[in-house]
Amino acid sequence: MIDFHCHLDLYPDPVSITRRVDAEGMYLLAVTTTPRAWQGTCSVVAGVRRIKVALGLHPELVAERHSEISLFRELLDDASYVGEIGLDGSAKLKSTLPLQRRVLEEILVACAQ
């Protein structure tokens, strides 16, 4: 089994999840919602072969965490995967759409370099 959308950093006990994934022979891509979470998640899954970690900046969090874009760029060279990026045009986040676009563009440019 492969799970391509798991926020391991949001589980209360991520270590137990890593053990279960390993024991059951599953594969998991842990998609982080912020660059800071990427660092912590990488530490939690160190040594677990079947779990990979994607560097992300969730569009829902861009308004409050856009200052982490510089950290995103710093970490990008060490990240094998990028995930949980994009745009959220829902009514709740519509006012942040211009900022989301700017941050997404910065991420895409950084990924292309």
Regions found by a protein language model. Name each.
Residues 1-113:
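Mid-domain alpha/beta scaffold segments of enzyme catalytic cores
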